[in-house]
């Protein structure tokens, strides 16, 4: 007869797996709330680079038209639906209904960032190539390209970076130089540029640094990072925002959770986006 009877205890509070749950990018672009319809039109207006003129020989001042560009953002419907039977909810460890709600919301938030990243990746102002090592000089090249295109270097600039590019920057003296930063690097939660699954607040060289775990080419010799102005990208979403209903089907005895949203993104000003291609394989 055994003299011990071991017991196994299962922790009821679940531990969230490592994945992105929040959108990091929607606050960095121009947003629009759509009341009704499947399209949102963003108007970009400028003078077209016009120069001042003098009065003509006929005594009249030459007139011109403004440069007005309407950019159409097409909204699509996006969903994520999780369903579990009553027995699975009853027999499984942890709060399965809470897990369903958490994961569906995360899926839609990742889709928001994916839409914005796809539009950024369509920019034609490019720097670097496969095998290019990330440097401060490369970043400054991007800054100059924006300045040459008359993009204001104001509080609306974002550097959306691969983890490896940030790793290279952090090894440079410029990263912690007081001339570049307005807070001490690594000083508490607000003093880090590393990804924290929530909107970033760290600024370097007067631009918002956003390290993102889901950018194109991650871990390869052709990683993509982006330097852009807020008005270069638009993102439209229905006024109701993200719907996250939950429910229970009595006839079939299953619980469900759904996240749904009508949304889309659009590149508005190509000159306001610089695409970096660099080698991050050494840190993959």
Question: PLM ranges: what are they?
Answer:
Residues 85, 162, 269:
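Residue-level signal for threonine
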Residues 86-153, 275-284:
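Alpha-helical scaffold segments that mediate packing/assembly in large oligomeric complexes
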Residues 122-199:
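Extended, solvent-exposed, turn-rich assembly/linker loops in the middle of proteins
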């Amino acid at each position: 007869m055994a003299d011990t009877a071991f017991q196994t205890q299962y922790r009821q509070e679940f531990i969230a797996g490592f994945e992105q749950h929040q959108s990091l990018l929607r606050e960095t672009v121009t947003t629009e709330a759509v009341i009704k319809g499947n399209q949102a039109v963003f108007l970009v207006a400028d003078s077209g680079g016009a120069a001042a003129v003098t009065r003509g020989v006929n005594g009249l001042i030459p007139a011109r038209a403004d440069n007005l560009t309407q950019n159409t953002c097409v909204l699509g419907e996006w969903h994520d639906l999780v369903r579990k039977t009553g027995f699975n909810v009853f027999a499984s460890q942890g709060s399965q209904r809470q897990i369903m709600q958490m994961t569906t919301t995360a899926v839609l938030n990742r889709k928001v960032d994916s839409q914005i990243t796809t539009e950024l990746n369509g920019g034609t102002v490019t720097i670097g190539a496969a095998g290019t090592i990330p440097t401060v000089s490369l970043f400054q090249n991007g800054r100059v390209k924006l300045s040459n295109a008359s993009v204001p270097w104001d509080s609306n600039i974002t550097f959306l970076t691969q983890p490896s590019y940030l790793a290279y920057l952090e090894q440079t003296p410029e990263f912690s130089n007081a001339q570049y930063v307005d807070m001490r690097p690594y000083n508490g939660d607000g003093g880090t540029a590393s990804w924290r699954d929530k909107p970033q607040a760290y600024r370097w060289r007067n631009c918002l640094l956003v390290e993102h775990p889901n950018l194109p080419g991650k871990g390869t010799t052709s990683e993509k990072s982006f330097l852009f102005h807020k008005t270069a990208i638009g993102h439209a979403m229905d006024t109701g925002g993200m719907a996250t209903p939950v429910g229970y089907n009595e006839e079939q005895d299953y619980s469900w959770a759904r996240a749904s949203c009508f949304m889309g993104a659009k590149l508005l000003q190509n000159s306001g986006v610089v695409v970096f291609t660099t080698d991050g394989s050494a840190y993959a």
